[in-house]
Amino acid sequence: GALASVYLAGEVVGALFFGRLSDRLGRRRLFMITLGVYLFGSGLSAFTLGTDTGWIIFLYATRFVAGMGIGGEYAAINSAIDEMIPARYRGRVDVGINGTYWAGAIIGTFASLFFLNVFAPSLGWRLGFLIGPLLAIVIIFVRRTLPESPRWQLMHGQVEEANASIDQIEAEVRKDGYELSPVDDSMAIEMKPGDDHGYWTLLKLLFTTYPRRAVLGASLMI
């Protein structure tokens, strides 16, 4: 109901805010920040200690913060997918990763039902809110070794850093026993730092350049 709507509103705000921050600070850094925001917000939700107005506001506020973290997650993740995954695999990878949102919602629902039936209701719903933060802690350790997006680095003039990131990725591929074919120089594209674009450019892109896609995307979320 209203709590889910607040969470969704937080996702929208988080996607806009952290998406822009991701363009400035990098995908890898935002992977850690947004996950930390979600962990903080969702973890605090479990510590709502009453039903009076103050605690209800606290619960809504923490769910909004958790939603911001998830919205920022998808902004950073989808940017990284677009920049690092080859075009012929990009759609499948995108569906697979974004599909985990709905898979996680289903798993979380059944887990919450389990907790509510096994433990007292006052404890069961809190445990449901703590599932996500516990998984987030594990994911933080996994993400520590992720390289920065070489394309993002090139767009920000970090040529040496981009080459180092590519070397790291290629080393991991070779470690798994795969051979990399030489790159055809004729397929190379020139990349250089671009101008900084704000929210006004985004609005024009959505409602002037691609209005049908904007309506379709909004309809799917509703």
Region roles according to the model:
Residues 1-222:
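Transmembrane-helix signature of 12-pass secondary carriers
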